[in-house]
A protein has these predicted regions:
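Extended substrate/RNA-proximal surfaces in nucleic-acid metabolism proteins
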Residues: 2-98
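Active-site metal-binding loops of divalent metal-dependent hydrolases
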Residues: 21-22, 80, 106, 139-141
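Short acidic, glycine/proline-enriched helix-loop-strand junctions
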Residues: 2-16, 112-137
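Structural recognition of alpha->loop->beta junctions
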Residues: 91-110, 149
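Short acidic/histidine-rich active-site segments
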Residues: 132-148
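Histidine/acidic-residue-rich catalytic or RNA/ligand-binding cores of hydrolases
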Residues: 28-33, 85-92, 112-123, 144-149
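A short, flexible low-complexity segment enriched in Lys/Arg and Gly/Pro that occurs
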Residues: 46-49, 102-123
């Protein structure tokens, strides 16, 4: 509301997107899906926004992607090289299921000062690009310890 008021009064403000990280099963592997730019309070996302974990069908990646799309958002595979299955396999499956993109640039070493992991990020970026998917960058910084991240 505050940003809208500032914008209405002629103040230049940044564009802020809604965002949420949702756990999902992709090829039997628990992954994180970033929901970006969705309609806040959309009923399709309520099961994922209650504070408790979903089970069964709502946990499947295709259900998560469908809910995000129903809410007008983009579904992005977060940090694809952090999981027990290979990033190439997960990205292929994500593309097949209708994901909109993947997190290409990420600090896999979790350094004290954020820096993308060049070799793996370049491979992921190229694969996402070849599949026509959006490519994002993320810090994966949760909480108040943001210094350097």
């Amino acid at each position: 509301a505050w940003l809208d008021q500032q914008r209405a009064s002629g103040v230049e403000v940044p564009t802020v997107w809604s965002g949420m990280e949702i756990s999902a099963l992709l090829k039997g592997c628990l992954v994180h899906v970033l929901a970006l730019g969705f309609e806040l309070n959309h009923p399709a996302l309520q099961p994922y926004n209650r504070g408790d974990a979903v089970v069964g069908e709502p946990l499947r990646a295709e259900a998560v992607v469908r809910a995000i799309h129903d809410a007008g958002g983009l579904a992005v595979l977060a940090h694809p090289a952090r999981y027990r299955l290979g990033h190439d396999m997960l990205i292929e499956e994500a593309a097949w299921l209708g994901f909109d993109g993947g997190e290409a640039w990420y600090d896999y070493e979790m350094q004290s000062t954020w820096s993308a992991s060049p070799l793996i990020c370049e491979v992921i970026d190229r694969q996402l690009s070849n599949l026509g998917l959006l490519r994002t960058c993320g810090t994966d910084t949760h909480g108040i310890d943001l210094c350097g991240r």
